[in-house]
């Protein structure tokens, strides 16, 4: 199994690479790519960790050598948020970066499963889909927006609030990956209940958690370490499913049946070809249903922005 990380010299990419070097199955290959000249050195640094995962680093304009033979590609390349910015302010820079990298994926490893971490995910996934479609290699079961950070934050915050072990809480999060489009389904956590006020406040905290980190870092960046952990969890789940493990379920932002929007984050059963089944979002509370209805315009606009970036 070969996993490529694009944007591997950045804060998320280095954290992700460290976790993958430690946790990928024995015999896996990990290839790191970034435009920054430090990238081969990051790979050498990680190569000293005694795990049976081969690692190589590549830098420069051309990601092709890193992508050859990749089964999974995780893209974290791009600029990070600064205080006062929201994820959509990143669009102008990051849209072009994602387009360029996905064009290289389309040529070099068109059958790979691709996880997009680069913000704004609501939009960059639509860009990636349109690029792959133009190249004639788009498979909607193999393109994912990585929203796992919303899930792990939800798990943490719920456990704190309710005095549970964080490892025992699993919150499904649906919708998109910014602001109001992030919808944790708090009503679906077994054995935990919330007052309406708790649910509203917790939902808001989960939606604004990225800003919490941006402000706490005081201009020094955005969520890199927790995002690295989230991306590693998703990437490792994908690898396990591709290798034939049964019953692997993760939420991610994918193209579905279009019931809510062209792309929508929902629980997915993963398998040997990527998405095996898009699972139902189940029964929502009145608060969740209202939040879902209220976000769809925003989500659809975000998606349209990505489609237009490629098609206009």
Curated annotation (Swiss-Prot):
Belongs to the LDH/MDH superfamily. MDH type 1 family. Keywords: NAD, Oxidoreductase, Tricarboxylic acid cycle. It is an enzyme of class 1 (oxidoreductase). NCBIfam families: MDH_euk_gproteo (TIGR01772). InterPro entries: L-lactate/malate_DH, Lactate/malate_DH_C, Lactate/malate_DH_N, Lactate_DH/Glyco_Ohase_4_C, Malate_DH_AS, Malate_DH_type1, Malate_DH_type1_bac, NAD(P)-bd_dom_sf. This is Malate dehydrogenase. It comes from the Bacteria.
